[in-house]
Amino acid sequence: MTNYLGITIDYERDNRLSNQADTLMRDYYMLDHESSPQEAFARASVAYCGGDLDLGQRIYDYASKGWFMFASPVLSNAPDGDGGNRGLPISCFLTYVGDNLDSLIDHNGEVAWLSVKGGGVGGHWGDVRGISDKAPGPIPFMKVVDSQMTAYKQGKTRKGSYAAYLDVSHPDIEEFISFKVPTGGDINRKCFNLFNAVNVTDDFMESVINDTEWQLKDPNTGTARNTVKARELWQRILEARFRTGSPYINFIDTARRHLPEAQRKLGLSINGSNLCNEIHLATSEERTAVCCLSSVNLERYDEWRASGMVGDLIRFLDNVLQYFIDYAPEELGKAVYSAYRERSVGLGAMGFHGYLQSKGIAWESWQAASENYKLFKDIKDQSTEATYQLAVERGECPDGVGYGVRNMHLLAIAPNANSSILCGCSASIEPRISNCYVHRTRAGSHTVRNPYLEEALESYGQNTKKVWASIIESEGSVQHLEFLSQAEKDAFKTAFELDQTWVVEHAAKRQEFICQGQSVNVFFPSGTDKAFVNQVHLKAWKEGLKGLYYLRTTSGVTAEKVGTKVDRNALKDFVDDEVCMSCQG
């Protein structure tokens, strides 16, 4: 045990980190003078403890034990008291674009500053008038942002990231859906460096179900510019998702219904989402919403559930917000204003599939559904108690005056791929894509095996190179291993082997407790029946999800290639470097 920055750290806890996690820490999160990941954990814990070293000690202990992990910017940009400017602890933002030249120009400037500061950005373009003889429509302006993403680097090699949101009723929606597809259309209007997302309304989904026509209306005048078959437009959206992974689908009416009453009374509204579709906060000409994230490790739930950690993390994230408010540059004034007014945080989770597998529970089971409900109800209850207590101690946030809360929102589940590596658990609330794969990042290549499967194989005396080679040859599957019981085969099914209605089922049931949203991916082998793909997407809307993130396919993927992100962008393969670093909650 050693005293460091006013708290006690344990260098022996480095042994809890995998080689991959240790490499990631040293290459991306530790400062030059830091000799151990423990010092980096301590730096972040103390930097945002608000002067309460007892809280800093507890936060350090939680992180160093792998019970939770800081979002990437919270950890990498935490100051160490030497007066140096390490950047901001928040790097995910939601913006709004108005239908006037001043707003368009202002948006370009804001995106530039957000990108320079390491931010990933989601932008809503639905109010920008469509293409006509007097207006170019929103896509040429998106093309400007597309170029900005290559101009403003974040770190040594990573470019900026931006997701554009457009309403399904917008006159330019058909071109927008395909602006990442490399073939067809004007290449000068393609936006390969952006991600696209469609705001899908309840009326549109009803029109799809009833097979009626759908009007595309100019947001400036409200008049119909074109009429299309709703089902044909929906089919184009799903086909683009199957080909490129996007557009994300944002069920905007569902999100708006769940905006807190206090904010609805203030006339606020949700217009879109963020880069990873888990943040659902109000935006406007005056507000750029911010995502203040970190994630608990569900695989260690039995260790931390009665520790008080969840309450401490809400307090900690409130401190992180305050640091952002105090130190963000004036160019981020809209983001600072939003953070000050609503103080929303997004405590997330990772390790859900690993938690189930550690208990031998199959994903496709009502036992899994019961565990899912229990976990997220507990996290929400503890978070709510914490924000009530903070309101008493520190005061209500301005948006929540009279409601007794310090933070308007508490929970949001981000992709958190890097955080899951550091904690040695499965990513986010996703099913594992493979039981064995080579994880390639700029930090190097690492073979990753499912530790719970490894335990099962060991119990059979089958933890051998030959067996693991057969798993790799089977694209990460264990269904061919005859010595495993059917219950074990069910527990170790991979994402592409699962019935995706269960992915949606679990997401829908936990959404009751997630005041913001979830980065929910769906997984379909190539050749999946289109009717089933449609069925899963319809279920997501009917069951009350706020959105769907990527549609992932098996095209070109093997157990060797599978990582934490299997996206298709302009038909090129990705490595895990291109996972949204801004949402590493």
Spans of model-derived segments:
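Extended catalytic cores of very large enzyme megasubunits
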Residues: 1-585
